C-alpha cells in the first residue's frame, strides 16, 4: 500500500490531475483509505513534499493531488509569472489561468539540484547503500567502500581518481525519434556531485537554469549579424565537455572578448580607477546586447573564468557591466572586389549616418555616454584612421573574415590578445574623438602606459608557444603599432614604448622576413609574411619619425627605398593583400606612406656621432641630393603628406644654399652675392608658400585632428574625369557636403578662400581623417616660421642695393620685391593659422612655444650704416631657437634668466655664446674665431639662420 500511495503522490509530467486514468484514481483512493486506517504509516508515505517527486517506471502513471486537493506543484503559466498557483482538480484550472483565459499545463520537466539529502562523503556505508538503491543513471561510488567489485564501479573509481566528469557529446541526444524531441534537456547525475569539488559542484549543478541542447545561447543575433562564441575547453579549469566536443563547436568568426582572467593583471591597471573612473555601467544599445549575451552559459568555459571579478580598469572606458559578457565580432560579408574594379566607399559597411555618441564612460569619470560596439570601432578606424596611416595594414574584409578568426588550442591566450587589441583600438578612438579640452593629458598617458604594460606581459607566453597561429601574432603586433599611434597622436615623449616594441618585433624575426621577401617576388610569398613585413615597415616609419621629431638616434637604421610600393601596392590576385578595396584610397594611402619613407631616408645620418660628417656630407655638398627629393619637387603635391615632404626638401635646400657660402664668405664676389640673393629669394618664398598650403589644408580638412561623426570623409569620387589644377581636383560637385567645418571660423574660411571652392579635390578624401603626425608637423612649421619670418622684409632692401651696384643687371629687382612682398603677406596668414590649427589633446598639452619665440624675435639686419651694424647683428644674434631638454636633445637658451613653467626642471645654457650647437662645432673644427666680424655681416646673419635651421632638423622638431 505504501508503494502504491507513494507512486501516485505527484501528477504525471505534462498531464493535469483531471486526466488521470480510472485505475490510477482507484488505486489512489485505496491508498487514502489505508492511510486513514494507519495514520503513522500513511502520513509518512502518502504525503509528498512540495517541489519533490518520485519517478515512476510507467510513463502513464498519474501524479498529482486527488480528492479535490490542490496540486503539489504550480502550473507552467504560474511558474512563468512567478505567482502562487491554486490549481484545483474539480475546476481543472487555477484562478490565474482562469482570469487570463489560459489552460493549466504541466509540461516543464524539473531536475533535481544539489546533492542528495543527507549525503555524507565520508560515510562509506551511506554511499554503498545509496548505490544499491539508486538507478543506474544515478550511481555513485566511494573509494573506501568494500564489497563492491563490479565493472561499472571500477570505471567510476577510475573517473574519480582523475577528478573529472566526462559526458558523451551533446549531439547524441539529437535523434530522429519523437521521444527525444520531447526530452530536450541533458542532465548531470545528481549523486555525482559528491565526487566533485565544491567549486565544480556549484558551477555545473547549481546554475541559473538547465542547459538546453537545442537552444544554443552562444549563437546570438546582435544588430542583425550572426555571431558565434569561439570558446574552447580549458581542461585545467574543470570543463564538463570533452576537448574534442568543444573544438567541434568552435566558431569560425572573430570575437572581441572583454574579460581576461585575473592572473594577467599587473599593478599598473589600478591607474585606470583614479584617472578614468570606469565604474558606471554602460547604457544604450550595447547594454542590451550585453544583457542577452550574459544569460548564455558557454560550454567549455570554466566557472573560475565566469566567476572571476574583472577589474573595470582594463580599458579606459570599459565598465564592469560591459566586461562580464563576451560580445562577439561578426563577419562583414563584403563582395570580393577584383583589382581593376573600384568599389565606392558607400557600398562598404559603415557606421550609420549622422552623429554617433562617444564611447563608454568618458575620460575623467564622465557618464551618460554610450559605448561603441566592436563593429563601430572597426568602421570608425577604416573611415577616419586607415586612410592617412594604415596602422592595421590590411583591408576591412581581410581583418574581419580572416585575421580576427582566431581559435586555436591556446584559447585563453588568444582571448587576451583580442581583448587588448580591442582596448588599444578603443583607446585610439577615445582620445581622438571631438570633445572639449577639459581633461588633462595625464589621464590619457596613464591609460596608454597601463594598456602597453598589459600587452607586454603577454609576450613571454606568446614567445614560448612555437605553434601559435600567425594571425595571433599579427593581431598582437598590430596592438603595439596602435599604441605607438596613440603616443604620436598625443605628442608624448616616451621612447620606452617604441624601444620595447622594436625589441619584440625583432624577437619575432620580422627583420629576417623582410630580407627574405625583399630578394624574391612578394606575390609568391605567404600572405601572412607580407603582412609581417608591412608591420615592420610601419614600425621603421614610426621610429624614423620619432628620431626626427626628438632628435634622437634611430633604433632601426634601415633604408626602405621603394619598399612601400613593393609591399603595399601588390599586383596579387589575393584580395586579402590589398591595403584597401578602393583603388583611389590605395593611392592616397601610398602617398601618405611615402612621407614616412622619405623621413626614414632623411634620418639615416642619425647613426653618426661625427657632427662634421653630418654637416659636410648632408648640407654642405651640392652633390648630395636624393632622387626622392628631385622627384617630389617636380610633382605637384596634393595631400598634406606630399606638401610636408616638399617642405622638408625646400628647407634642406635653403640650409644647403646658405651653408655653402660659410667658408668663402669673405671671398665672395659681388656677382656671386647678387646671384645668391636671387636664389635665396626664390628658395625662401617657395618655403613660405609651402608652409601656408600645409596650414590651409589642415584648416580645411581637420583643424583639431579629431574624429567628428558630423564631419566625415568623402564617400564618392569621380575618377573618370581628369584632375584639374595643381591639386589634382575633379569636378565632382559636393553641394551636399560643403566644406563647412563646424569647428572652424567662418570669417577665416572666407578670408582664406576655403568656402568658395565647391569642387572636390583628391586631397579632400582625407577630410575628417586623423593623422599621427599632426603635432610634430605643426611644431616644425612653427619653428621654421619663427626663424624665417623676418627675412623677407630684410631681403627687400638687400636686393635693391645689390642690383644697383651690379653693372650687368639681368635681373629685374621689381620681380624679386613682388615675391618678397607676397611672402610677407603669407607670413601674416601663417601666423593667424598657427593660432587656429590645434591638434593638441588635453588642457595641459605642450603647445608651440609662442612666448619663448616672441621674446627673442629681434630685427633682421638690413643695409644699415656701418656705425649701427654691430648693434643690429647683436639684436639678430638674440634671435635664437630655444629647445626643451625634455625632448631628448641638448638644452640651450639665450636667456639665462628665463623660466619655463611647462617643464618639471629648469633649462640651462650649454654654451655662453649665442650661436647654434652645430655652428660652434664647425667653428672649433675649422679654427674660426666666433668673435671675428665678417666683411658681409648681413650675409652672415642669414647663414646664422641656416645654422639654427640645421639645429632644428638634426636635434628635433619638438
UniProtKB/Swiss-Prot annotation:
Family of this protein: Belongs to the EDS1/RGT1 family.
Signal peptide (residue range): none
Biased composition annotated in UniProt, kind: Low complexity: 21-64, 124-164, 730-740
Pfam families: Zn_clus (PF00172)
Annotated function: Glucose-responsive transcription factor that regulates expression of several glucose transporter (HXT) genes in response to glucose. In the absence of glucose, it functions as a transcriptional repressor, whereas high concentrations of glucose cause it to function as a transcriptional activator. In cells growing on low levels of glucose, has a neutral role, neither repressing nor activating transcription.
Gene Ontology CC terms, in alphabetical order: cytoplasm; nucleus
Positions of region (Disordered): 1-73, 113-165, 197-218, 291-322, 720-740, 884-908
Keyword Transcription: yes
Organism, as annotated: Vanderwaltozyma polyspora (strain ATCC 22028 / DSM 70294 / BCRC 21397 / CBS 2163 / NBRC 10782 / NRRL Y-8283 / UCD 57-17)
CDD domains, per the entry: GAL4 (cd00067)
Residue spans binding DNA: 75-104
Molecular-function annotations in GO: DNA binding; DNA-binding transcription factor activity, RNA polymerase II-specific; zinc ion binding
PANTHER family per UniProt: GLUCOSE TRANSPORT TRANSCRIPTION REGULATOR RGT1-RELATED, GLUCOSE TRANSPORT TRANSCRIPTION REGULATOR RGT1-RELATED-RELATED
Subcellular location: Nucleus; Cytoplasm
Name the UniProt record assigns to this protein: Glucose transport transcription regulator RGT1
Keyword Magnesium: no
SUPFAM superfamilies referenced in this protein's UniProt entry, alphabetically: Zn2/Cys6 DNA-binding domain
Main location: nucleus
Gene this chain is encoded by: RGT1
Compositionally biased region (Polar residues): 884-898
Keywords: Activator, Cytoplasm, DNA-binding, Metal-binding, Nucleus, Repressor, Transcription, Transcription regulation, Zinc
Amino acid at each position: 500500500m505504501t508503494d502504491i500511495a507513494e507512486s501516485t503522490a505527484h501528477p504525471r509530467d505534462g498531464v493535469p490531475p483531471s486526466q488521470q486514468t480510472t485505475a490510477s484514481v482507484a488505486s489512489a483512493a485505496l491508498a487514502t483509505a489505508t492511510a486513514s486506517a494507519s495514520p503513522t504509516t500513511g502520513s509518512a508515505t502518502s504525503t509528498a513534499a512540495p517541489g519533490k517527486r518520485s519517478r515512476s517506471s510507467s510513463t502513464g502513471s498519474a501524479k498529482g493531488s486527488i480528492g479535490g486537493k490542490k496540486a503539489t506543484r504550480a502550473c507552467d503559466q504560474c511558474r512563468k509569472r512567478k505567482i502562487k498557483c491554486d490549481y484545483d482538480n474539480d475546476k481543472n484550472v487555477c484562478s490565474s489561468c482562469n482570469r487570463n483565459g489560459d489552460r493549466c499545463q504541466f509540461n516543464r520537466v524539473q531536475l533535481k539540484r544539489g546533492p542528495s539529502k543527507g549525503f555524507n562523503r565520508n560515510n562509506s556505508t551511506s554511499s554503498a547503500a545509496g548505490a544499491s538503491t539508486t538507478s543506474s543513471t544515478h550511481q555513485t561510488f566511494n573509494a573506501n567502500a568494500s564489497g563492491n567489485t563490479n565493472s561499472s564501479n571500477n570505471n567510476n573509481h577510475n573517473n574519480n581518481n582523475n577528478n573529472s566528469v566526462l559526458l558523451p557529446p551533446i549531439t547524441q541526444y539529437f535523434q530522429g525519434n519523437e521521444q527525444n524531441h520531447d526530452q530536450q534537456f541533458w542532465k548531470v547525475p545528481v549523486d555525482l556531485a559528491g565526487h566533485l569539488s565544491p567549486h565544480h559542484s556549484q558551477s555545473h549543478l547549481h546554475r541559473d537554469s538547465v542547459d538546453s541542447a537545442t537552444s544554443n545561447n552562444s549563437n546570438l543575433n546582435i544588430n542583425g549579424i550572426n555571431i558565434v562564441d569561439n570558446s574552447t575547453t580549458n581542461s585545467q579549469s574543470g570543463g564538463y565537455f570533452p576537448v574534442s566536443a568543444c573544438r567541434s563547436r568552435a566558431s569560425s568568426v572573430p570575437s572581441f572578448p572583454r574579460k581576461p582572467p585575473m592572473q594577467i593583471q599587473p599593478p599598473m591597471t589600478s591607474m585606470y580607477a583614479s584617472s578614468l573612473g570606469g565604474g558606471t555601467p554602460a547604457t544604450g544599445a550595447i547594454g542590451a546586447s550585453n544583457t542577452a549575451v550574459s544569460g548564455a552559459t558557454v560550454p567549455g568555459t570554466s566557472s573560475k573564468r565566469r566567476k572571476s571579478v574583472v577589474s573595470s580598469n582594463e580599458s579606459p572606458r570599459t565598465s564592469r557591466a560591459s566586461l562580464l559578457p563576451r560580445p562577439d565580432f561578426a563577419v562583414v560579408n563584403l563582395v570580393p572586389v577584383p583589382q581593376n574594379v573600384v568599389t565606392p566607399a558607400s557600398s562598404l559597411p559603415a557606421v550609420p549616418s549622422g552623429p554617433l555618441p562617444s564611447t563608454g564612460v568618458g575620460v575623467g569619470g564622465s557618464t551618460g555616454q554610450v559605448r561603441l560596439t566592436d563593429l563601430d570601432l572597426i568602421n570608425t578606424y577604416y573611415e577616419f584612421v586607415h586612410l592617412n596611416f594604415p596602422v592595421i595594414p590590411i583591408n576591412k574584409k581581410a581583418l574581419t573574415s580572416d585575421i580576427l578568426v582566431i581559435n586555436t588550442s591556446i584559447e585563453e591566450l588568444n582571448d587576451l590578445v583580442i581583448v587588448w587589441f580591442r582596448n588599444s583600438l578603443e583607446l585610439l578612438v577615445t582620445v581622438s574623438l571631438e570633445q572639449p579640452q577639459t581633461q588633462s593629458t595625464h589621464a590619457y598617458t596613464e591609460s596608454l602606459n597601463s594598456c602597453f604594460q598589459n600587452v607586454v606581459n603577454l609576450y613571454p607566453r606568446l614567445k614560448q608557444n612555437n605553434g601559435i597561429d600567425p594571425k595571433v601574432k599579427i593581431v598582437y603586433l598590430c596592438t603595439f603599432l596602435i599604441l605607438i599611434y596613440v603616443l604620436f597622436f598625443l605628442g608624448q615623449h616616451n621612447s620606452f614604448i617604441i624601444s620595447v616594441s622594436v625589441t619584440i618585433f625583432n624577437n619575432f624575426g620580422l627583420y629576417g622576413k623582410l630580407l627574405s621577401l625583399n630578394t624574391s617576388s612578394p606575390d609568391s610569398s605567404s600572405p601572412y609574411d607580407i603582412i609581417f613585413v608591412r608591420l615592420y615597415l610601419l614600425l621603421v616609419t614610426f621610429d624614423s619619425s620619432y628620431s626626427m621629431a626628438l632628435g634622437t638616434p634611430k633604433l632601426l637604421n634601415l633604408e626602405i627605398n621603394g619598399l612601400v610600393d613593393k609591399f603595399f601596392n601588390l599586383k596579387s590576385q589575393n584580395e586579402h593583400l590589398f591595403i584597401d578595396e578602393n583603388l583611389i584610397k590605395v593611392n592616397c594611402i601610398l602617398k601618405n606612406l611615402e612621407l614616412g619613407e622619405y623621413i626614414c631616408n632623411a634620418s639615416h645620418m642619425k647613426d653618426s656621432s661625427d657632427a662634421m660628417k653630418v654637416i659636410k656630407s648632408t648640407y654642405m655638398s651640392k652633390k648630395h641630393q636624393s632622387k626622392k627629393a628631385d622627384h617630389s619637387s617636380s610633382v605637384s603635391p596634393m595631400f598634406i603628406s606630399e606638401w610636408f615632404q616638399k617642405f622638408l626638401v625646400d628647407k634642406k635646400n635653403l640650409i644647403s644654399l646658405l651653408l655653402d657660402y660659410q667658408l668663402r664668405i669673405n671671398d665672395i664676389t659681388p656677382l656671386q652675392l647678387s646671384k645668391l640673393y636671387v636664389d635665396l629669394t626664390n628658395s625662401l618664398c617657395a618655403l613660405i608658400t609651402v608652409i601656408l598650403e600645409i596650414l590651409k589644408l589642415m584648416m580645411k580638412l581637420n583643424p583639431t585632428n579629431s574624429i567628428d561623426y558630423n564631419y566625415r570623409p568623402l564617400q564618392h569620387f569621380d575618377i573618370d574625369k581628369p584632375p584639374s589644377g595643381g591639386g589634382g581636383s575633379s569636378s565632382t560637385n559636393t553641394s551636399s557636403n560643403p566644406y563647412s567645418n563646424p569647428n572652424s571660423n567662418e570669417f577665416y574660411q572666407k578670408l582664406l578662400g576655403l568656402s568658395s571652392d565647391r569642387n572636390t579635390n583628391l586631397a579632400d578624401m582625407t577630410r575628417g581623417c586623423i593623422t599621427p603626425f599632426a603635432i610634430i608637423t605643426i611644431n616644425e612649421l612653427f619653428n621654421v616660421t619663427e626663424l624665417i619670418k623676418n627675412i623677407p622684409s630684410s631681403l627687400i632692401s638687400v636686393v635693391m642695393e645689390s642690383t644697383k651696384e651690379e653693372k650687368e643687371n639681368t635681373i629685374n629687382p621689381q620681380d624679386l620685391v613682388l615675391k618678397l612682398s607676397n611672402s610677407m603677406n603669407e607670413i601674416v596668414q601663417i601666423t593667424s593659422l598657427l593660432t587656429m590649427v590645434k591638434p593638441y589633446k588635453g588642457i595641459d598639452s605642450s603647445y608651440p612655444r609662442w612666448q619663448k619665440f616672441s621674446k627673442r624675435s629681434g630685427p633682421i639686419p638690413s643695409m644699415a650704416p656701418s656705425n649701427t651694424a654691430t648693434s643690429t647683428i647683436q639684436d639678430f644674434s638674440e634671435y635664437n631657437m630655444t629647445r626643451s631638454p625634455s625632448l631628448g636633445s641638448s638644452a640651450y637658451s639665450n636667456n639665462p634668466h628665463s623660466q619655463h613653467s611647462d617643464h618639471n626642471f629648469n633649462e640651462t645654457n650649454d654654451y655662453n655664446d649665442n650661436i647654434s650647437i652645430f655652428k660652434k662645432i664647425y667653428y672649433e673644427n675649422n679654427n674660426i674665431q666666433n668673435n671675428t666680424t665678417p666683411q658681409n655681416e648681413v650675409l652672415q646673419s642669414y647663414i646664422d639662420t641656416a645654422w639654427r635651421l640645421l639645429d632644428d632638423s638634426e636635434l628635433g622638431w619638438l
